[in-house]
UniProtKB/Swiss-Prot annotation:
The lineage of its organism: Bacteria, Pseudomonadati, Pseudomonadota, Betaproteobacteria, Burkholderiales. One of its GO terms (biological process) is DNA replication, removal of RNA primer. SUPFAM superfamilies: Ribonuclease H-like. Belongs to the RNase H family. Its cofactor is Mg(2+). The keyword Phosphoprotein does not apply. This is Ribonuclease H. It comes from Ralstonia nicotianae (strain ATCC BAA-1114 / GMI1000) (Ralstonia solanacearum). Its main location: cytoplasm. It comes from the Bacteria. It catalyses: Endonucleolytic cleavage to 5'-phosphomonoester. Mg(2+) 2 binds at D9, D133.
Length: 151
């Protein structure tokens, strides 16, 4: 089974506001960078989009190590998701799960892979995380340019 390391990050200027996501996939000496942005979004949605797009890029089942600076993503997928599903996509206090559309998508995408989820401190000099952060900020700029072009 192919091994892939993923570094993901999201960025948001205003929350909600302009947002971007970035992800770096590394496997066997090959690297792939992906990024994108949205005009009106939240930081958590962009963090989720970064990992979703990483998994969408995988063409076959892989052993994946995901590094994220988002405790929301890391804890959500590792600790909270099973409970949300068991409760019909409700939190422990019976409120609807925020961003359930993205959580459902991520849940579907990871099922064919062996995945380990790792939290890293953001903006602490971790090279993979710093690259993902730079890509997420590129995504913000693309969203900004798209708005300006449409104005």
């Amino acid at each position: 089974m192919q091994e892939v390391t993923v570094y993901s990050d999201g960025a948001c200027k205003g929350n909600p506001g302009l947002g971007g996501w970035g992800t770096v996939l590394v496997s066997g000496g090959h690297e792939k960078e992906l990024f994108g942005g949205e005009a009106v979004t939240t930081n958590n949605r962009m963090e989720l989009m970064a990992v979703i797009e990483a998994f969408r890029a995988l063409k076959r089942p892989c052993r994946v190590k995901v590094y994220t600076d988002s405790q929301y993503v890391q804890k959500g997928i590792s600790e909270w998701l099973a409970g949300w599903k068991a409760r019909g996509w409700k939190t422990a206090d019976k409120k609807p799960v925020k961003n359930d559309d993205l959580w459902r998508t991520l849940d579907e995408l990871v099922v064919t892979h062996e995945v380990s989820w790792h939290w890293v401190k953001g903006h602490a000099g971790h090279p993979g995380n710093e690259r993902a952060d730079a890509l997420a900020n590129k995504g913000v700029e693309i969203a900004r340019q798209a708005i300006q072009a449409g104005a």
